[in-house]
A protein has these predicted regions:
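Short, basic/aromatic-enriched C-terminal tail that caps enzymatic domains
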Residues: 91-103
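Helical "substrate-binding/catalytic lid" subdomain
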Residues: 1-92
């Protein structure tokens, strides 16, 4: 939960600097509404499925945070995670291709 708190701290701090704190707080609250188990599964599945696109999105977000003069520690960590997911997917694809060639 400490990592989740760090995401909220970084996000709300940036939103405050950008003049859209109220909007972002509502967006975060809306994400937490509903079925928490489904949210966790959606985050896991969606991160793996869309890692390439999300890596680019968080890179753009990091640049924006830098432009605001705000820390981007969590955003940088998210970028590393999406890169890791891409590497894992590429390794799995390579293994599947290799296995298919042996069959």
């Amino acid at each position: 939960m400490k990592g989740l708190a760090a995401v909220v701290l970084e996000s709300v701090g940036a939103a405050e600097a950008a003049g859209c704190e109220t909007w972002l707080r509502a967006q975060i609250a809306a994400e937490f509404a509903g079925d928490p188990g489904a949210l966790v599964q959606r985050l896991l599945d969606g991160s793996r499925q869309h890692a390439g696109r999300r890596a680019h999105e968080v890179e753009d977000a990091r640049d924006y945070l830098d432009g605001l003069g705000r820390p981007s520690w969590v955003t940088s960590a998210a970028h590393r995670w999406f890169g890791q997911l891409l590497e894992e997917a590429a390794a799995a694809d390579h293994a599947a291709d290799h296995e298919g060639a042996r069959a």
